């Protein structure tokens, strides 16, 4: 019996209708490991079958009903007692009664809205899952199955380059340029750095990709910065007039799309952090936000061709007379020790 802690009298199993053919993707779990889950997109139907397997076939099992739920949920780790549901659908599969043998029940959630990307971060988790519940007088029998949702975007209509002149008065003036301000997750960041004035001895220069996760609202806001990548641009002293190319492939890093004010609970933003280190180990940096987005597998050739042309323009050598003009210079910030 299931009485007095001998285990449930039945077990539930959830199987998707297209489980044999549906793609699986790796997704990070809360403990940092990666597991594979079925992949869904916004608007797709979620259908399958719930099977009630009796531990003692032939013995009648009384229940108060069987239901299946599709849930989209945000959990803030500092507020684990509260789960914020932004999608909640339910279907009753069986009325209260008795089951004397294992039995299966079909379900279908049609064209389900899945507005946000699945995400597991430092302080927050956004998950989608199916939950089957066989209600009983003492202990319900529950089975959950997580899925992963990816949000796809179209090519941005406006994707201007980033151009900025930064410096420290009478000591250092540099000009940096990135070919775009919005990159898809498999994109290549192409750019260049041009030294206009060098009067301090720079020994090292790099670009970092920083992910900034912001959770909470009002006085209860938490920020987590995570350096995803470090890309060495230069090891040695630059000279005036020198131009250094940048070519950073994003495909090798664990990135997500930019997420802004998701359900008014959290945001995930990405920054390119230009870091210079002088011979006295002082660090100077300048951050620039970029937008990351996920594109589908099918790429329009015309847009790919335009992207290739844009890339080629930034791979060439820069000359003072052809450099873009700027309306002003921004200050490079010195990092606090």
Swiss-Prot record:
> Where does it live in the cell?
Cytoplasm; Membrane; Endosome
Q: Which domain of life is it from?
A: Eukaryota
Its membrane topology is listed as: Peripheral membrane protein
**Database matches in InterPro entries:** Arrestin-like_C, Vps26-related
Chain spans, region Disordered? 311-337
Give the UniProt record's GO annotations in the biological process aspect: intracellular protein transport
Does the entry annotate any disulfide bonds, and if so which pairs? Answer: none
Q: Which UniProt keywords apply?
A: Cytoplasm, Endosome, Membrane, Protein transport, Transport
Q: Kindly state one GO CC term assigned in the UniProt record.
A: membrane
Tell me the protein family, please: Belongs to the VPS26 family.
Quaternary structure? Component of the heterotrimeric retromer cargo-selective complex (CSC) which is believed to associate with variable sorting nexins to form functionally distinct retromer complex variants.
Q: What does this protein do?
A: Acts as a component of the retromer cargo-selective complex (CSC). The CSC is believed to be the core functional component of retromer or respective retromer complex variants acting to prevent missorting of selected transmembrane cargo proteins into the lysosomal degradation pathway. Retromer mediates retrograde transport of cargo proteins from endosomes to the trans-Golgi network (TGN).
The name under which this protein is listed is Vacuolar protein sorting-associated protein 26B
Name of the gene encoding the protein in the UniProt record = vps26b
């Amino acid at each position: 019996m299931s009485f007095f802690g001998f285990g449930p009298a039945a077990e539930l199993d959830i199987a998707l209708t297209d489980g044999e053919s549906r793609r699986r993707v790796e997704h990070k779990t809360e403990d940092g490991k990666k597991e594979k889950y079925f992949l869904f997109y916004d608007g797709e139907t979620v259908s399958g079958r719930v099977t009630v397997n009796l531990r003692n076939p032939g013995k009648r099992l009384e229940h108060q009903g069987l239901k299946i739920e599709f849930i989209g949920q945000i959990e803030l780790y500092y507020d684990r007692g509260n789960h914020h549901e932004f999608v909640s659908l339910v279907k009753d599969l069986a009325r209260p009664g008795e089951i004397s043998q294992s039995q299966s029940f079909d379900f279908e959630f049609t064209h389900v809205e899945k507005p946000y990307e699945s995400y597991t971060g430092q302080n927050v988790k956004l998950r989608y899952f199916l939950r089957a519940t066989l209600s009983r007088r003492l202990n319900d029998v529950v089975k959950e199955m997580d899925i992963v949702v990816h949000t796809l975007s179209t090519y941005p209509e406006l994707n201007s380059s980033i151009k900025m002149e930064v410096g420290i008065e009478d000591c250092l003036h540099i000009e940096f340029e990135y070919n775009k301000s919005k990159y898809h997750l498999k994109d290549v960041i192409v750019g260049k750095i041009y030294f206009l004035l060098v009067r301090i001895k720079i020994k090292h220069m790099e670009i970092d990709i920083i992910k900034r996760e912001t959770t909470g609202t009002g006085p209860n806001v938490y920020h987590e910065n995570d350096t995803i990548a470090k890309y060495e641009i230069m090891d040695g002293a630059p000279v005036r007039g020198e131009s250094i190319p940048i070519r950073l492939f994003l495909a090798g890093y664990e990135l997500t799309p930019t997420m802004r004010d998701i359900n008014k609970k959290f945001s995930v933003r990405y920054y390119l952090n230009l870091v210079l280190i002088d011979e006295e180990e002082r660090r100077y940096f300048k951050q620039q936000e970029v937008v990351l987005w996920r594109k589908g597998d099918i790429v329009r050739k015309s847009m790919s061709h335009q992207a290739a042309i844009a890339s080629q323009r930034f791979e060439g050598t820069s000359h003072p007379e052809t450099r873009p003009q700027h309306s002003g210079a921004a200050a490079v910030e010195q990092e606090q020790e």
